[in-house]
Amino acid sequence: MNELPLLRFIPFRRSDLVKMCLARGKLEPSTQQVFQNACSAIEQYFQTDFIQMRQGLKQAYAPLDPDADTRVVEQFRDTSDSEGLALLLGQTLDRANYEKITRDYLDRAFRSASLFKVRLHVDLEDFDEVLLYARGARRKEEMVPRIMGFFPKAVTFTNFDRVVLYIRFKEDADTKGTLGGCQPGSTMLKLFQNVPAADMEMLFPNTRVGMRWIDKLLIGVPAVVSGGVVMTTKLGATMVLLGSLLGFWFGLSREPVTLDKSSVVVLAAGMGALVGYLLKQVSSFRNRKLKFTQALTESLYFKLLDNNAGVLYRVLDEAEESECKESLLAYYFLLENAEPMSSAELDAAIEEWFAQTWNCKLDFEISDALAKLAGLGLARCVDQHWQVVTEN
């Protein structure tokens, strides 16, 4: 089993991280105030920094938003809006510690067995562009029932805490097919939680539910058996009569068949039984497929966190929060140590603290955090060793 990469995401709130750092009890009261002042400076810096990014994303997404209640003036519309949106969104998600899911990974996920025990089909050619980003990949184990809901088996799979889906619809999208609810030329954004890698098909708007071979057997075998019973019990007389008629018509028999009232009744009863049997099998197939579709819909109801413009605002907030957390952690550990530290030493100290104190293994982005501190004038590097600058 391949090991999953460590998370870049720090799963603690910014305000809690400040308290967690101070709870170490290694700073004097005056130095604690220095730390608090640095936290305020860091927060103000990123608030200003993300204002421009927020405006850029809003401007790029406005003409593509399927939920917009404002008119688009075509003569002022920038044709590069979609490309600009994809680029800006990718940069924002990277700062929010999301990882891009490659097409190769997505294809392998599509080929893997679904935990829903249904067959899902997605045609990516229905879209102009598809992008997927995920955060919080981890191994999970669940007991999945196998035969007739019994004999559960432990299944280990990769699960994502968060998944962002970006879809740009074609200008000539078929709104009468599986994309009935889409707006041609628009861009759809979705944010989901708790998504198994093997079930990513369910996130797409054109997902079609199919049936596995075991489900077809559960319908087909009883259908064949009951069909045999119907043939022998209810269609016996009808089949004999039809055989006699066909034999006479094709010259296989010289004995004429008399179609009296009772014969017609037998034929009608037999045909009625056959039609009723076929309708019952079609209904059984549709009901089973409807059951799977309902299970899929119920699952998505609890997994969907946000749509379209709401996704932008949410990931912007997460990106700002992540940048602040990384910077204040790097500053605190530099402030706590009297001696300057190399970036590797600082990185190891922070990761060890999370692992030992908070049972949280992560990959801290030390280079980015130190670059931000240097830009703010809160830290400087001398001979490849970093120290805080407190003369502010």
List PLM regions with ranges.
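Transmembrane alpha-helical hairpins and terminal membrane-anchor modules
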Residues: 213-299
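Short, cationic-aromatic polyanion-contact patches
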Residues: 385-392
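Short alpha-helical segments that sit at the start of domains
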Residues: 294-340, 362
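A short, conserved structural fragment
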Residues: 370-384
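Basic, amphipathic N-terminal segments
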Residues: 1-224
